[in-house]
Every structure is written in C-alpha cells, then in structure tokens.
C-alpha cells in the first residue's frame, strides 16, 4: 500500500472528476493507437517529445520507479498528472494488469485533439493552485 510519504511525492494528484475525464480519454486514445503504456514506453515517448501528456499512478510500489518521468516532462515542457490507482489506469489502458504510467501521444489529425487540449488546460490549472 502507498504510504503518506509516497502521497507527498505524487503531485499533482488529479481529483475524482478529472481522473474520470483522463481515464476516458486514455481509453479513446488506446482505441486510436495514440497511447504508450508502461514506464519504459512512457519514458521513450517523453524523451522523443511525442507525448501530449503523461499519467502516472500514485500507488506504484515503489514510487521511485516513476519519479524520473516528471523530471523529463518538466525538461520537455510536457504536462503530467498522478491518478490514485494503477488498477484503474490498467483498465483504462485495456490491459489485464495494473499500469503505473502511460502517455497520450501526438497526432495532428486525431479526432481527440479538442479533448486532449481540454485535459492539458486542466492539468495546467492544477499547477496554479
């Protein structure tokens, strides 16, 4: 189980409404082939600047396996957010196992462009608080 020190490191943490919006967008992105699943693929997408935004699981054990990704995101100016459950993230990614990280990737012709922009705006607002 995630302890309180992990919760302090997992910032910004999405609220329940934003989490549902993000998980829904992840499902749609997966159906369109715009999703990278897992910490390694996520790291590659961020390094190559092909990620629109990154979603990380706050209950990953140990959380340190993910903490290099926010640093990369900040270097590349890619928004990121933590959600509370790796199991929910796995279900949204259409994987039978928990997923600790995923990245929605860039596609200029995507039907999801407006939804991705809305989520990115919401993620930017998390940092203002």
UniProtKB/Swiss-Prot annotation:
The keyword Iron-sulfur does not apply. GO terms for cellular component: box C/D methylation guide snoRNP complex; nucleolus; precatalytic spliceosome; small-subunit processome; U4/U6 x U5 tri-snRNP complex. PROSITE patterns: RIBOSOMAL_L7AE (PS01082). Binds to the 5'-stem-loop of U4 snRNA and may play a role in the late stage of spliceosome assembly. The protein undergoes a conformational change upon RNA-binding. The keyword RNA-binding applies. Signal peptide: none annotated. It comes from Dictyostelium discoideum. Pfam families: Ribosomal_L7Ae. GO terms for molecular function: RNA binding. It is found in: Nucleus, Nucleolus. This is NHP2-like protein 1 homolog. Keywords: mRNA processing, mRNA splicing, Nucleus, Ribonucleoprotein, RNA-binding, Spliceosome. Its main location: nucleus.
């Amino acid at each position: 189980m995630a302890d309180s020190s992990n919760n302090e490191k997992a910032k910004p943490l999405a609220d329940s409404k934003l989490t549902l919006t993000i998980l829904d967008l992840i499902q749609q992105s997966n159906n369109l082939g715009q999703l990278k699943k897992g910490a390694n693929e996520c790291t590659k997408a961020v390094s190559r600047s092909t990620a629109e935004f990154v979603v990380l699981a706050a209950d990953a054990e140990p959380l340190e396996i993910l903490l290099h990704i926010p640093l990369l995101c900040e270097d590349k100016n890619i928004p990121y957010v933590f959600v509370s459950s790796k199991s929910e993230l796995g279900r949204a990614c259409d994987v039978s196992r928990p997923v600790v990280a995923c990245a929605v990737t860039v596609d200029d012709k995507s039907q999801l462009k407006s939804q991705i922009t809305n989520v990115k705006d919401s993620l930017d607002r998390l940092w203002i608080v």
